[in-house]
Design a protein with these regions (language model features):
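Short coil/linker segments at helix-helix boundaries
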Residues: 23-25, 29-32, 40, 44, ...
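Extracellular carbohydrate-recognition regions
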Residues: 502-532
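Carbohydrate-binding surfaces in secreted/extracellular proteins
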Residues: 522, 568, 632-666, 698
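Short carbohydrate-recognition loop motifs
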Residues: 533-552
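Secretory/extracellular carbohydrate-interaction modules
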Residues: 546-613
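Short, aromatic/His-centered strand-loop micro-motif at the edge of beta-sheets
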Residues: 615-639
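Extracellular beta-strand elements of beta-rich domains used
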Residues: 696-703
Length: 704
């Protein structure tokens, strides 16, 4: 429960921001009812037929019991990961017993993917599930779910692979509409949720011929048809406008935007009036109001959506997005909405956790890491983070260690390191959750820093550590070493941090002297920051990335400065694959633009052959595309030289570019800026499933 003291403190913050609390009562409709309806539909369409057709199998009884348990665990308010191991054990026993029904395998894959971060086992079983589905005569709903499952298991995967699986799911959804009895009027909310929440807007807009019929089915009630038609008009509005900044939108784009949003307002308003107990139309109207095509405010429509279903999270996210300054909103409103989510005290829902998501959005509107840290150090925010973790720990007993990690992060963010230290003792053997790790990485931090700073604080060394950090920022290494040398009785939890700091001092001292320094990726990867991807360090210092999709990025923590010369080798285990894209990244991390100022020297495999280009990481802003014939089945040497914002790059002994200007007036159009805290590392944009890239240690020296 949320204490009255915390609730009143939050209400004072909301009053100061002019943001009324979100109305909530114990009887407010929540997603619990929706999940119950969804489980009932899945049981009718998939699970009951599975039980009937496998009744004579030796594994039938266990499969039936497992299916019921898995459905309850997966399709509920929150999956309790502490129970995943037991369900995963039952899943593996079914596989050993020979269970081969596609419905059973579909549930097995979902459970295995929840058990641990490594989803390779789940992927392998997913392929078998899809094969079994194609051999059988199961509802096309299962084909949709298996395809969506496939897309989900491509964790950071190639857009081509993910989108291909999602489009296949849409085709199966269309086929399922033709099945008698699969979709009835009662399932209208399930259908709308599937269409609006699972298939991204960009995918829908770029495949209009496929999705247009899906938004205009004739079997659902009028309110549902009006909701879908209005939602489709919103998609068409953005398709006409484009995703560029307002000054770059064409006159015709603005005309289409207005015409379609006017139609959307008509259909969505009618849908809401026909059935105000459903949240979908009101949520869609938040975006329409944001663009100025509603007489009522976005907050009015948000209140209507949450009155229909308090924890309809798309409404909360839409309201936060509409509150951004770029849409005429205010940062104060974004902050207030995040706090208002906690103020509801509804720990039986996901609403209080929106505090984290809301602050994530606000952080993107701030400039610089200190401004971001200051946000979390605000007394109201610090107290709210602690209260959120305590509330969920009390409401979900099976997730105590999970929320302990969030408490540890909240304490570290807000500067309450004593809370972090206490929470870390309660995490047990649970590894750091991916969501916690990614938020640390956003701040160029990791678990070593989190644990180390908490341990140093407990030992009374915080002031000394901060002095050392300040000296490091100024590159005053003698002063930093002087502080570290005086630290006595360093706790074991802090030793990895102190040892790493000494290594970085040594590397940067040598770099400052113009010496060559080797940046090796040992198995601990303790000197590297993994911003994306499942990187592995090897005993020989090589870095390995195995195909899990795209956007893998890992940078070394040593600062290389704005001018450097570097060399190494790169190799592919599957050089014949036509969809590879990998290389070397350099630049710096930027909180106000999460991907940061990373520029990549990439080797590209395509159907046209091998080529090389310079790119802004995460964005298709390539400025060079030159053919290369190097044989990447063996280590191929590369060199990079960056000086005065000009890049010279060789690959396999040949020049890819020479003195290519990257500055503000160059081809990257200001997307690269040299800084004293620049870093270097490895990247991939596309790494097909099952293939790997091997990078040798980077040898680098700083230039004057």
């Amino acid at each position: 429960m949320l204490s009255e003291e915390v609730r009143q403190a939050i209400r004072r913050e909301l009053a100061a921001a002019g943001f009324p609390p979100v109305r909530s009562s114990p009887g407010s409709p929540t997603v619990h009812e929706s999940f119950a309806a969804y489980r009932g539909w899945l049981h009718r369409v998939l699970v009951a037929p599975m039980k009937a057709r496998s009744a004579d199998k030796p594994w039938a009884a266990e499969a039936a019991a497992f299916a019921d348990a898995a459905m309850e665990a997966l399709y509920c308010q929150r999956f309790v990961t502490d129970g995943a191991a037991a369900l995963a054990g039952r899943a593996r026993k079914l596989l050993t017993a020979g269970a081969d029904d596609p419905v059973v395998l579909w549930l097995v894959v979902d459970i295995l993917s929840k058990e641990k971060d490594d989803v390779s086992e789940a992927r392998a079983q997913g392929a078998k599930a899809r094969e079994a589905f194609l051999r059988g005569d199961t509802s096309k709903v299962l084909g949709m779910l298996l395809s969506l499952q496939q897309a989900r298991l491509i964790r950071t995967g190639s857009a081509l692979e993910r989108d291909g699986a999602a489009l296949k799911a849409a085709e199966y959804l269309a086929a399922s509409l033709k099945e008698p009895g699969t979709w009835t009027a009662v399932e209208a909310p399930i259908y709308i949720t599937t269409l609006r929440s699972i298939f991204p807007g960009g995918l829908r807009r770029s495949n209009k011929d496929l999705f247009q019929p899906l938004f205009h089915p004739d079997r659902f009630p009028e309110w549902a048809r009006e909701t879908l038609t209005g939602s489709w008009e919103v998609d068409l509005a953005w398709d006409g406008r484009g995703n560029d900044w307002a000054p770059k939108v064409t006159k015709e784009g603005w005309i289409q935007f207005g015409e379609h949003l006017t139609k959307a307002e008509k259909h969505l308003t009618k849908a809401w009036k026909l059935e105000p107990s459903q949240p979908f139309a009101a949520t869609g109207m938040i975006a329409v109001a944001m663009a100025g095509y509603s007489s009522d405010s976005g907050r009015d429509w948000f209140d209507r959506a949450t009155a229909a279903r308090l924890d309809y999270m798309p409404a909360w996210h839409a309201m936060s997005w509409a509150s951004r300054p770029r849409w005429g909103g205010r940062k104060e409103t974004m902050r207030a909405l995040a706090l208002a989510a906690l103020e509801t005290g509804r720990f039986d829902t996901d609403i209080p956790f929106f505090l984290v998501a809301g602050l994530d959005g606000l952080r993107q509107e701030l400039r610089g890491s200190e401004a971001c840290r200051d946000l979390y150090r605000q007394p109201a925010v610090a107290v709210a983070l602690q209260a959120m973790c305590q509330g969920y720990a009390g409401a979900v007993p099976g997730e105590l260690s999970h929320w302990a990690w969030w408490r540890a992060l909240g304490g570290w963010l807000s500067g309450r390191l004593e809370d972090t230290c206490t929470a870390l003792t309660e995490t047990g053997t649970r590894p750091i959750p991916g969501e916690v790790r990614s938020r640390l990485a956003d701040l160029m931090s990791d678990e070593i820093l989190l644990r180390g700073e908490a341990a140093l604080d407990k030992a009374g060394h915080t002031a000394a550590w901060q002095t050392a950090v300040e000296a490091h920022g100024k590159m005053d290494f003698p002063a930093e070493l002087g502080v570290l040398d005086k630290l006595m009785d360093i706790p074991a939890e802090a030793k990895p941090l102190i040892d790493r700091q000494r290594r970085l001092i040594g590397m940067e001292t040598n770099l400052a002297a113009g010496e060559w320094v080797k940046l090796s990726a040992d198995p601990s990867l303790s000197d590297w920051l993994r911003l994306d991807g499942a990187w592995v360090g090897q005993a020989d210092g090589n870095a390995l990335i195995t195909g899990d999709g795209d956007r893998a990025l890992m940078v070394h923590l040593a600062r290389i400065g704005p001018a450097f010369e570097a060399r190494g080798t790169i190799q592919s285990t599957h050089p014949e694959n036509p969809r590879f894209c990998a290389g070397i990244a350099f630049g710096h991390h930027s909180l106000d633009s999460k991907p940061g100022q990373w520029v990549t020297a990439e080797i590209v495999w395509s159907k046209q052959g091998k080529s090389a280009m310079i790119n802004r990481s995460y964005y298709n802003t390539g400025i060079l595309d030159k053919a290369t014939v190097a044989d990447f089945s063996k280590p191929v040497p590369w060199t990079l030289k960056l000086q005065d914002d000009r890049l010279t790059w060789t690959l396999g002994g040949g020049f890819i570019c020479e003195n290519e200007f990257l500055g503000r007036d160059g081809n990257l159009k200001g997307h690269y800026t040299t800084t004293s805290d620049g870093r270097v590392g490895f990247c991939t944009r596309v790494t097909p499933m099952g293939s790997s890239m091997i990078y040798s240690p980077i040898e680098i020296r700083r230039l004057k």
